[in-house]
Regions:
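SF2 helicase catalytic motif II
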Residues: 205-231, 235-236
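N-terminal targeting/trafficking signals and adjacent low-complexity tails
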Residues: 432, 526, 576, 617-666
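A substrate-engagement module of RecA-like helicase motors
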Residues: 1-183, 190-193, 240, 247-261, ...
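Conserved helicase motor "Helicase C" RecA-like lobe of SF1/SF2 P-loop NTPases
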Residues: 480-509
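A contiguous, basic/glycine-rich beta-loop/short-helix subdomain that forms a polymer-engagement track
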Residues: 157-182, 193-202, 305-440, 447, ...
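Conserved RecA-like ASCE P-loop NTPase motor core of nucleic-acid helicases/translocases
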Residues: 52-60, 393-397, 471-478, 482, ...
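Conserved RecA-like P-loop NTPase helicase motor core
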Residues: 434-453, 506-625
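Conserved interdomain hinge at the start of the Helicase C-terminal
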Residues: 384, 441-478
Length: 666
């Protein structure tokens, strides 16, 4: 029995590891040693890479698909020799192995990745049938055939997945193998922006052109990509896994493996002790955090430890063994490698002991302690891309305000080009409304949302506008809390009922899965207004939520967009407070830019083609200030008028829609 258990447990024993620190290998060679994840994207001898090439990154899968479809329509996507284009995606998007996809659906991305790697190793004879061994000449030829078919004509991700199914070949690794010979590579943000992802894919940006679409998201994405969280529960679970692993394999660990497992145990116990010691939330610089862990932890070579974790894939070994032990007494696996992966990501963040990082510690009596690494300055994360690429294009429909982006690249390399809007200026009407119908000053600060008089004035203002605006009207609130405050007041005063007699009132749901149903109801009401709401519909939305980012309101869906107040982010949030403090004198500009970028994105949901038109009403006297107006998009800024009286905005709005009706008739 003991001999049988030993044999069955061998798959969890970490392989002998020779530290690159002792063998004097370069970082490039170490990257080549990542056998499994990068095997089909790594170069072969004599396998020349296509250069230069274009890397096109965007935020969502649908935007990448749309780009490929547009390429197909150009001369570059047609003819006998179209541009060699390939799309890279995640396992969730591209894996065709039923069991791996099922595990991903049940247990998440990390579990899906773990199962894929297990099948790649081929332990117990269970190798992925879609991925041949790199050492297999026949398999190599089949992968080359996939590459040739993938690059023969322009195809989107769905096409490449179907090609994999037809050829019985893994499209996830097939596209990575194809990327070396592509001229145009489309990929999601994280594969471009994360250094580890670029290394795993062997993406060489030298001399290439990098295009980042939807670039208004770039700074936030960089900061989020390099953030890392670790909870007390994950620390406790990781401690248990390391101790369980040592009880089983301590006598069989040698050299670096034994040393690093012991170091890992010391670090985890220090984190465990700090969780007990801390009684209130606080913020540490990286050196202070390491010092607070106490003992000899500050002397640990975190770079070496993190590299060992990554090279040996010890997280999967420990998690797999913990799952095996768990299964002996439970019915289903717990996928315990997740805790070790969270630890690995956190250690990677700690390896950057620069002045631009902070560790935020949150102490909660119910949920325990949570550590979060926060990157304060996105420039360090973006600099490797800037220094490698021949050119970088930051593109977006609404990029203003631009000053934050100027800090990402050297000033001598930064130029701007802004196209005019596709619609004539006469199709855009902008109005700053500082006063309500009864003369109430409109300034929607945090305190004003608790003032009944202000909310009553807002309801009357919207009621007046609904008499004039045809079809659809989208009203953006700064937050769900402010929307809830307005709705509560209007229900109490029956103002909501009065508004609904003109336009059917719908509100943006907090659950994203319910958004489509609300949009369908909104569009249906506009297309065929009921007698109870003869003037169409009004959609109450939230800045920064689903409707302000990913939804386009063209034609009758948004003949008027109303911005209520200024959506300044919560300045007292710990993360934002740290960013603003780090920015110093530039902090105020950064804060205003965050607000106005959100405003501009919301307004940009309307007017989607050259025949479209819309009015934009800015209900807050602060929109009259130069520092606010100067940050509006040019196509709106040139059309904005400040109205000293509410009635003036009513007349201007009525005149605008009268002109639009006249032009449509002629």
């Amino acid at each position: 029995r003991r001999e049988k258990d030993t044999l069955s447990d061998d798959e969890f024993l970490v392989n002998d590891y020779h530290d690159a620190q002792d063998s004097f290998l370069s970082a490039e060679v170490r990257a080549m040693m990542h056998t499994y994840e990068s095997q089909w994207s790594a170069p072969n001898i004599g396998d020349d890479e296509t250069r230069p090439k274009i890397f096109y990154a965007s935020r969502t899968h649908s935007q990448l698909v749309q780009l490929v479809h547009e390429v197909k329509r150009t001369p570059y996507g047609q003819g006998d020799e179209p541009v060699r284009c390939v799309s890279l995606g995640s396992r969730k998007q591209m894996c065709i192995h039923h069991d791996v996809r099922r595990i991903g659906a049940l247990f998440g991305t990390e579990a899906m990745n773990e199962r894929c790697l297990e099948l790649m190793e081929g332990k117990k004879g269970k190798r992925c049938p879609y991925l041949p061994a790199q050492s297999d000449p026949v398999g190599r030829a089949e992968m080359d055939t996939y590459r040739d078919h993938a690059l023969s004509h322009v195809q989107d991700m769905e096409d490449l997945v179907q090609l994999g199914k037809d050829m019985h070949m893994c499209p996830y690794f097939g596209t990575r193998h194809s990327a070396r010979h592509a001229e145009l590579v489309t990929l999601p943000y994280n594969l471009l922006l994360l250094r580890d992802a670029r290394e795993a894919l062997h993406l060489t940006l030298d001399g290439s052109v990098v295009i980042i679409d939807e670039a208004h998201n770039l700074i936030d994405t960089l900061l989020a990509t390099y953030a890392a969280e670790l909870t007390q529960a994950q620390i406790e679970q990781a401690v248990q896994q390391v101790e369980m692993y040592l009880r089983r394999f301590s006598m069989r660990l040698r050299g670096t493996n034994e040393e690093q497992v012991r170091i890992l145990q010391v670090l985890l116990r220090a984190l465990q002790g700090l969780c007990v010691e801390l009684t209130e939330s606080q913020t540490f610089s990286l050196p202070d955090f390491m010092s607070r862990l106490g003992g000899s932890v500050d002397q640990i070579n975190l770079v070496r430890l993190e590299r060992w974790l990554k090279d040996t894939r010890i997280a999967r070994k420990m998690g797999g063994y913990a799952d095996k032990v768990w299964l002996e007494t439970h019915a289903a696996p717990a996928h315990r490698a997740v805790a070790m992966h969270a630890l690995e990501a956190f250690l990677l963040a700690l390896c950057n002991r620069a002045k631009n990082g902070r560790v935020l510690v949150t102490v909660d009596k119910m949920q325990g302690v949570r550590f979060k690494y926060l990157l304060l300055d996105p420039r360090d994360a973006f600099e490797p891309i800037v220094s490698s690429a021949r050119a970088i294009i930051l593109a977006g429909g609404t990029m203003e305000p631009m000053s934050d982006f100027e800090q990402l690249v050297p000033r001598d390399r930064f130029t701007t080009f802004s196209c005019g809007h596709i619609v004539p200026s006469s199709h855009v009407m902008g109005a700053v409304v500082p006063l309500g119908p009864k003369g109430q000053t409109l300034e929607f600060t945090h305190a004003s949302w608790q003032q009944p008089a202000m909310l009553d004035e807002l309801a009357v203002a919207l009621g007046n506008y609904t008499n004039i605006v045809p079809h659809g009207m989208v009203v953006f609130f700064p937050s769900y809390a402010t929307l809830d405050a307005a709705l509560a007041r209007w229900q109490h005063t029956h103002a909501l009922e009065r508004l609904s007699r003109r336009k059917k009132v719908l509100t943006e749901p907090k659950d994203a899965k319910d958004v489509d149903a609300v949009l369908q109801q909104y569009a249906a009401t506009i297309a065929d207004p009921p007698p109870s709401s003869p003037k169409g519909a009004m959609l109450l939305a939230v800045v920064g939520a689903k409707l302000s980012e990913g939804i386009n309101f063209q034609d009758d869906l948004a003949r008027c967009v109303v911005m209520i107040g200024l959506p300044f982010p919560h300045a007292k949030s710990r993360e934002l407070a740290e960013r603003l403090a780090f920015a110093g004198e530039d902090g105020r500009d950064m804060y205003v830019n965050m607000c106005m970028r959100a405003v501009n994105q919301s307004m940009g949901r309307a007017i989607r083609h050259r025949a479209d038109y819309a009015a934009f009403l800015l209900l807050d006297r602060r929109y009259a200030r130069e520092q606010i107006q100067s940050r509006l998009p040019g196509w709106i800024r040139t059309q904005v008028q400040v109205h000293d009286r509410f009635g003036s905005s009513i007349r201007a709005l009525a005149q605008f829609f009268q002109q639009m009706r006249y032009r449509a008739a002629t």
